[in-house]
């Protein structure tokens, strides 16, 4: 199912937000469509308050908490540079940070309530695709932009989002293609897949399966498991029974338990090739395991190499940062929101949403907020090329092109998060 026109969708969202506002609002803080046609005046009636307020719903707790520090750092660095350059619409951008938790809690929904109560115009998050899906309707029906730096589920390409959802991370169709190609090119003709059962895990497993089998390999067993399970012995036993040459692990922090069970059942990484994904590639989750447990294990993470100069700038806002995963995507999300508000001359979500596509492609290229906003003020169209790469949003709010990094663990059960073994670039629709 293809989305309806984003312009119509945003107009619909604007009318819904206006209706909500008419029932009474709160004081601003700091810190399937198919609706009837909406008159243009409805959208025009929803205006911002003159101060762009960005909220974050990013993981401070939960199974993706290790992604929180680089994502918060990316947002903070972008806002520092934006405000140092004069802010948006002549005022400093306000920020409100909240926790996304994970799917085992209701933290994200409570955080969104807080942000909407404080009149956030755009919300950056969540990191988890399932968490984002759970809060998307609440955010977009309020006429607020939701912008994730890390969601990769293919489901968001066609989801009913009122034209207000965007992401700088690519859909899993690209990561799945790269991972499937990697598994086969490493000489594996039989593959087992252990994937967490949610939109992220199942969707990525589908794409890996398709790609690997098109390349001539056979997926001999696939197990979609409950990530909340206490143990995974039966799941691993199903994989072991089919004796694959490679095992693809798609999950979050529960992967540590899966790894322990693989070792227990004799499917160690020196006997069977393991492959991971962005959700479980971690430099903290496996440190307590015996040395070399993960030695040689490869995994994929969306995103190009974070330039060394960018990493140094990140350290100015968080000197303790050691992981840069999705920092660039968070930085670009924040910068794009600010540029879109400048282009719209309005900070409201329904006004800036259509401009997000416009500022991402088709105009004069620029690579930072200051140079881009100077071009906008001179009356020129811009094409923001970010730290994460050229964004070039398509009509679904997805980046049109993206890069996937291939990483490898060493004997200390860690990988070099600053530099991949290789980077593979591709078109999302390709």
Which sequence ranges carry the predicted segments?
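Extracytosolic ligand-binding ectodomains
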Residues: 1-18, 22-430
């Amino acid at each position: 199912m293809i989305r309806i026109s984003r312009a119509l969708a945003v107009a619909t969202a604007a009318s819904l937000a206006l209706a909500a506002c008419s029932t009474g609002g709160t004081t601003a803080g700091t810190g399937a469509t198919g609706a009837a046609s909406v008159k243009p005046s409805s959208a025009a009636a929803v205006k911002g308050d003159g101060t762009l307020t960005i909220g974050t719903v990013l993981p401070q707790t939960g199974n993706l908490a290790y992604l929180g520090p680089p994502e918060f750092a990316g947002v903070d660095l972008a806002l520092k540079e934006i405000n140092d350059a004069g802010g948006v619409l002549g005022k400093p951008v306000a920020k409100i940070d909240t926790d996304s938790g994970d799917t085992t809690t209701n933290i994200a929904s409570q955080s969104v309530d807080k942000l909407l109560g404080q009149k956030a115009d755009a919300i950056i998050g969540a990191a988890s695709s399932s968490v984002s899906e759970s809060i998307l309707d609440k955010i977009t029906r309020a006429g607020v932009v939701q912008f994730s730096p890390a969601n990769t589920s293919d489901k968001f390409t066609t989801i009913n989002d009122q034209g207000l959802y965007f992401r700088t991370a690519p859909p899993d169709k690209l990561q799945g293609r790269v991972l499937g190609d990697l598994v086969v090119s490493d000489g594996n003709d039989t593959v087992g897949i252990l994937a967490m059962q949610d939109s992220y895990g199942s969707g990525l497993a589908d794409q890996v399966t398709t790609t690997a089998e098109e390349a001539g390999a056979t997926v001999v067993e696939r197990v979609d498991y409950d990530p909340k399970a206490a143990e995974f012995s039966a799941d691993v036993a199903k994989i072991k029974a089919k004796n694959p040459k490679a095992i693809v692990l798609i999950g979050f922090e529960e992967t540590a338990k899966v790894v322990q069970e693989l070792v227990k059942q004799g499917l160690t990484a020196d006997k069977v090739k393991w492959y991971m994904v962005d959700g479980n590639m971690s430099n903290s989750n496996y440190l307590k395991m015996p040395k070399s447990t993960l030695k040689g294990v490869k995994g994929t993470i969306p995103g190009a190499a974070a330039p060394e100069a960018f990493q140094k700038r990140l350290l100015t806002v968080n000197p303790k940062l050691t992981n840069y995963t999705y920092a660039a995507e968070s930085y670009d999300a924040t910068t794009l929101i600010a540029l879109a508000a400048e282009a719209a001359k309005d900070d409201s979500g329904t006004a800036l949403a259509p401009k997000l596509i416009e500022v991402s492609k088709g105009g004069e290229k620029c690579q930072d907020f200051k140079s881009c906003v100077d071009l906008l003020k001179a009356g020129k169209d811009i094409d923001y090329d970010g730290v994460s790469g050229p964004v070039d949003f398509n009509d679904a709010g997805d980046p049109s092109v993206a890069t996937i990094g291939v990483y490898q663990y060493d004997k200390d059960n860690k990988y070099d998060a600053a530099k991949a073994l290789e980077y593979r670039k591709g078109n999302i629709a390709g």
